[in-house]
Regions:
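Charged, often glycine-rich, active-site loop that binds/positions anionic groups
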Residues: 113-132, 275-289
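Sec-dependent bacterial lipoprotein signal peptides
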Residues: 1-30
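Conserved N-terminal glycine/acidic-rich loop preference
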Residues: 144-147, 168-204, 213-262
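Structural recognition of the beta-strand scaffold that forms the well-ordered cores
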Residues: 63-68, 72, 105-110, 143-148, ...
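Oxyanion-hole/transition-state-stabilizing segment in secreted/luminal serine hydrolases
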Residues: 77, 128-187
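Catalytic His-Asp segment of secreted/periplasmic serine-dependent ester chemistry enzymes
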Residues: 218-317
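C-terminal region of N-terminal signal peptides and the immediate post-cleavage residues
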Residues: 17, 28-52, 56-57, 317
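Serine-esterase "nucleophile elbow" of acetyl-processing enzymes
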Residues: 46-113, 164-170
Length: 317
């Protein structure tokens, strides 16, 4: 259980220092990160040449608005876009999708740390100032909206970040999340589902003719984990991916109930989780080896999701 299939211990150069990882996790898992120091921009990943070039002229595709949190924003994936406080990449999946579709117009208002209230009504604080509610970007002319949200609502990234273990002698932290027989994350998912439904309704009210797609979270870790390559107890690894699955399944149900679509990114990220060899990863681990924030998609992951989404949109769902 030292490493999952495809993992090579010798292929982990240039790991980000633990202190930087701690800063990034703090910045990415709270909306109010006004005082966080600027995060460094890492060098271009080896797969960057495969990314479609940004800056293309508007095409004949849909008028597109991308909403969501850091899973969509792709923090620290080159190049970082304005506003810098949102830690948003010009090569996140929304940008890849927009370029692949030849979007007639494109507004990427995703922002790391966003919760549902930041999409709907709250000016989200960032380290460079507040940004308007993301819903402000949606108009009656909008034809396509993608949304990735929910992880921060239930504090899943923050909880995962606090559960790193240096020894298997330390009890798994997932046991602490079940109190009196009630799973705290499961309870939060159910409690927030109405807010996600309300968000969809608000989008449909502003853009009645728009195609709305809720984009899920991926396969972050294989069931057995890969301790000690990634400092996650195998019990916690299985638990947290189960919670991601639970979140995705609930978002899928919300989409079905509200008459919109859900795009499941889990199948395409199987085998590309934090335990994969560095060149195969779509999601980085606690100490990224490709330019990305800890426990977030890298450039290859954003490219894969954006490309798959473009195929899905073009095929009509």
């Amino acid at each position: 259980m030292v490493g999952g299939p495809g993992y090579e211990r010798g292929m982990a150069p240039n790991r980000i220092a633990p202190t930087v990882v701690a800063v990034l996790l703090t910045a990415l898992t709270t909306s109010a990160c006004v005082d966080a120091p600027p995060a460094p921009i890492a060098s271009e990943p080896s797969s960057a040449a495969a990314l479609p070039a940004p800056g293309a002229a508007p095409g004949s595709g849909p008028r597109y608005v991308a909403m969501g949190d850091s899973a969509a924003a792709a923090p620290l994936v080159p190049d970082q876009a304005e506003p810098v406080g949102c830690l948003k990449s010009t090569n996140g999946y929304p940008s890849v999708l927009a370029r692949r579709m030849g979007a007639a117009s494109f507004a990427d208002v995703t922002c790391s740390g966003a919760r549902t209230e930041d999409l709907v009504s709250r000016a989200q604080p960032t380290r460079t100032g507040a940004v308007p509610p993301q819903l402000d970007a949606v108009t009656a002319e909008t034809q396509l909206v993608t949304v990735t949200v929910g992880g921060n609502d239930v504090d899943l990234p923050k909880i995962a970040a606090t559960c790193r273990r240096s020894s298997l002698d330390t009890p798994p932290c997932s046991a602490d999340l079940v109190v009196d027989g009630v799973d705290q994350i499961s309870e939060a998912i159910e409690a927030d589902a109405d807010d996600w439904s309300g968000l969809v309704d608000d989008i449909r009210e502003k853009a009645p003719a728009a195609r709305v797609i809720l984009v899920g979270y991926g396969t972050y870790v294989r069931p057995e984990g890969c301790f000690p390559a990634e400092p996650v107890n195998p019990v916690d690894a299985a638990y947290f991916q189960t919670k991601v699955d639970e979140l995705d399944d609930r978002l899928s149900q919300v989409a079905a109930d509200r008459g919109v679509e859900f795009f499941d990114t889990r199948p395409l990220s199987v085998g590309h989780d934090i335990c994969a060899a560095p060149e195969d990863r779509y999601i980085e681990g606690f100490a990224p080896v490709n330019p990305a924030a800890p426990l977030h998609p890298n450039g290859a992951g954003a490219l894969a999701v954006g490309t798959a989404l473009a195929d899905y949109v073009s095929a009509g769902g």
